[in-house]
Each structure stands twice: as structure tokens, then as C-alpha cells.
Design a protein with these regions (language model features):
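SH3-family beta-barrel domains
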Residues: 1-16, 25-26, 35-38, 45, ...
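N-terminal charged segments
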Residues: 22
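Catalytic cores of peptidoglycan-degrading enzymes
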Residues: 112-129
Length: 129
């Protein structure tokens, strides 16, 4: 079975426990194979880098097919609409073009870089969240 992340960022852990080490983060729209499940956790293997870890079962949904979109969020956060709700997908997330809201930064690279200054390191992190 193939799953897709439905939240801004999902924490991937080394073991099926909220206290386990964070090993990675899954960004909105990223897909993965479901390898194993228990009552609360799903063991997943990411499609883009084959990373394996455990995520909470409530934080993903079944994907109809493996269809990774090629539209990548380039802003620090990109508001997107999902089922009449707005969430903020972090930079690097994959989104469908029709779900994007227009954001126009004249100097986006410099602007985004300044926002990331002094961001603390997060083991296993892929965003500053």
C-alpha cells in the first residue's frame, strides 16, 4: 500500500513510540510505502530516498497511486487549500498546482535565507519546525 502525508510535516521515528529518536521528517505531499502497521503506528519507507521509520497512523492517508507531483514549495511556508481548509506546507513540499495560493516575494531567496538565520539544529529535521 502507498501512503501520502496530509500534514505540513510528519515526524518519523526510529521506533513506534512518541519518545523514540526522530530520524527524519516527511513533508506535505511526500509518498511512502507502508511496510508494517500496529494499533497506533505505521512503519514506512519513503519513495524519494528509501528512508525507513515509524509515523503515527493518523498522519497519513492511502494514496490512490504513486503520483509524486513536480510542483515544489519554494517559500518558507506556502498556504494551500485541502478540503476547504488551509494548511501551510513548508519549503520543499510537493503540492498540486491547483492547490497553491500566489505569493510574490521580490527577493525571495534573500528573504527566505534571512528567515532561516539562527534556526536551531533539529536532528532528523528537514525544516525549521
Amino acid at each position: 500500500m502507498i501512503g501520502v502525508n496530509i500534514l505540513s510535516v510528519v515526524t518519523m521515528r526510529a521506533e513506534p513510540s512518541d519518545k523514540a529518536e526522530i530520524v527524519n521528517q516527511i513533508l506535505y505531499g511526500e509518498t511512502f510505502d507502508i511496510m508494517e502497521e500496529n494499533e497506533k503506528w505505521s512503519k514506512v519507507k519513503l519513495k524519494h530516498d528509501d528512508y525507513i521509520g515509524w509515523i503515527d497512523k493518523k498522519q497519513w492517508k492511502k494514496a490512490e497511486q504513486h503520483q509524486q507531483t513536480t510542483n515544489v514549495v519554494k517559500e518558507i511556508f506556502q498556504p494551500i487549500t485541502i478540503d476547504d481548509k488551509t494548511i501551510f506546507a513548508p519549503m520543499g513540499s510537493f503540492v498540486e498546482k491547483r492547490k497553491l495560493h500566489k505569493i510574490d516575494y521580490k527577493n525571495s531567496i534573500l528573504h527566505d535565507a534571512k528567515l532561516l538565520l539562527e534556526t536551531p539544529y533539529l536532528w532528523g529535521g528537514r525544516t525549521f519546525m
